[in-house]
């Protein structure tokens, strides 16, 4: 990842967990202490292997396990981790190592961004969604009762280590949810990659390691290109929010009972409907192509049964892409190309949301 004078490596491959300590020492040679943050689901699977790899490299490592789930992305949990940093005697050469999915990465990243005004962060994503999206780009944060990621900071990791072997332990539902972000990358930037995903759906869901490695590597490439051009989301990087306007609103409206990727899938379909109704989409019925692909990946493409689209409206008004009271929508023009625009009529939005009604 190249960010002007800043740069950091993204490692993608099988068997990287055993090399974690050596990789940290290579890129953070001054680091002698670390706080390893993981959750209750990941700790029994990889917690000891990660800690041992760090210790073998001469890095004294304290391990902290937080409850699994979105509720851990809170200021109270961050406060608890600050106390763990103090007990572990971390200094500005020490590292926070985030071992887990997006929740752990966002939470631990926020702590690394703010403890001692910023210490090194190592992302070790263990879910597909985290490997292809949330571990890259430096966004960290916690939630408030009023919505997701309302408190946060930009803090780039010192390195990302994505061991695709960890995907073997993922429940099928989480693997599918991660594929929503993969599809997003194809729609916003690379139609050839989108076609590859369409062809490889069966192999993805079967957990084919070679296919998953390519899916992760290509997604990382696409996201890295976008983030490198716009690290702090002043322009181009906003395209990575395709599907997230409605997706984040849906997550909050239903109390986070669906996975993030499931809500993003619905959000992408909504954006495609709105783009067609607004005359922005240049290719006919992209929403049908998207719907077919997402459904083959076992992802939802409509709202939960019985949900009124109007229930999304209060949460849409809190979208982070609002400027001067107007949402800037990420709209698909054609596969591989999107545009960010505030020029979307209320009628088109209503029509697009109604199209999601089950």
UniProtKB/Swiss-Prot annotation:
Subcellular location: Cytoplasm
A Pfam family recorded for this sequence: DHQ_synthase
Pathway connected to this protein: Metabolic intermediate biosynthesis; chorismate biosynthesis; chorismate from D-erythrose 4-phosphate and phosphoenolpyruvate: step 2/7
Keyword Cytoplasm: yes
Amino acids binding Zn(2+): 181, 244, 260
Obligatory cofactor(s): Co(2+); Zn(2+); NAD(+)
GO BP, sorted A to Z: amino acid biosynthetic process; aromatic amino acid family biosynthetic process; chorismate biosynthetic process
GO cellular component entries: cytoplasm
Gene Ontology terms, MF aspect: 3-dehydroquinate synthase activity; metal ion binding; nucleotide binding
Keyword terms of this UniProt record: Amino-acid biosynthesis, Aromatic amino acid biosynthesis, Cobalt, Cytoplasm, Lyase, Metal-binding, NAD, Nucleotide-binding, Zinc
Record note on cofactor: Binds 1 divalent metal cation per subunit. Can use either Co(2+) or Zn(2+).
Sites where the protein binds NAD(+): 102-106, 126-127, 139, 148
Catalysed reaction, written as an equation: 7-phospho-2-dehydro-3-deoxy-D-arabino-heptonate = 3-dehydroquinate + phosphate
Listed EC numbers: 4.2.3.4
Major localization listed first in the record, in broad terms: cytoplasm
Source superkingdom: Bacteria
Keyword hit for Endoplasmic reticulum: no
InterPro entries: Dehydroquinate_synthase, DHQ_synth_AroB, DHQ_synth_fam, DHQS/DOIS_N, DHQS_C
SUPFAM superfamilies in the record: Dehydroquinate synthase-like
Family: Belongs to the sugar phosphate cyclases superfamily. Dehydroquinate synthase family.
Protein role: Catalyzes the conversion of 3-deoxy-D-arabino-heptulosonate 7-phosphate (DAHP) to dehydroquinate (DHQ).
Matches recorded under NCBIfam families: aroB
Protein name in the entry: 3-dehydroquinate synthase
Organism: Symbiobacterium thermophilum (strain DSM 24528 / JCM 14929 / IAM 14863 / T)
């Amino acid at each position: 990842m190249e960010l002007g004078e800043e740069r950091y490596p993204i490692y993608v491959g099988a068997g990287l967990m055993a090399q974690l300590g050596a990789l940290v020492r290579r890129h953070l040679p001054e680091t002698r202490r670390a706080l390893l943050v993981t959750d209750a689901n990941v700790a029994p699977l990889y917690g000891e292997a990660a800690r041992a790899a760090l210790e073998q490299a001469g890095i004294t490592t304290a391990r902290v396990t937080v409850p699994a789930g979105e509720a851990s992305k809170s200021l109270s949990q961050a406060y608890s981790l600050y106390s763990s940093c103090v007990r572990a005697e971390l200094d500005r050469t020490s590292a926070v190592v985030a071992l887990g999915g997006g929740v752990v990465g966002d939470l631990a990243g926020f702590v690394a961004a703010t403890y001692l005004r910023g210490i090194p962060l190592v992302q070790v994503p263990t879910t597909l969604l985290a490997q292809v999206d949330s571990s890259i780009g430096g966004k960290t944060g916690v939630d408030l009762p009023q919505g997701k990621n309302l408190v946060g900071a930009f803090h780039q990791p010192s390195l990302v280590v994505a061991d695709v072997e960890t995907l073997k332990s993922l429940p099928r539902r989480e693997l599918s949810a991660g594929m929503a972000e993969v599809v997003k990358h194809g729609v916003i930037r690379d139609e050839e990659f989108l076609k590859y995903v369409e062809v490889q759906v069966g192999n993805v869901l079967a957990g084919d390691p070679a296919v998953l490695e390519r899916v992760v590597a290509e997604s990382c490439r696409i996201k890295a290109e976008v983030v490198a051009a716009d690290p702090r989301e002043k322009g181009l990087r906003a395209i990575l929010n395709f599907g997230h306007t409605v997706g984040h609103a849906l997550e909050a409206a239903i109390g986070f009972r669906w996975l993030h990727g499931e809500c993003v899938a619905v959000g992408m379909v909504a954006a495609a409907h709105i783009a067609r109704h607004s005359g922005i989409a240049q290719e006919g019925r992209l929403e049908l192509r998207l719907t077919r692909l997402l459904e083959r990946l076992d992802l939802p493409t409509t709202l939960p049964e019985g949900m009124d689209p109007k229930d999304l409206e209060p949460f849409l008004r809190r979208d982070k892409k609002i400027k001067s009271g107007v949402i800037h929508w990420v709209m698909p023009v054609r596969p591989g190309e999107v545009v960010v625009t505030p020029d979307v009529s209320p009628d088109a939005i209503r029509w697009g949301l109604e199209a999601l009604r089950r």
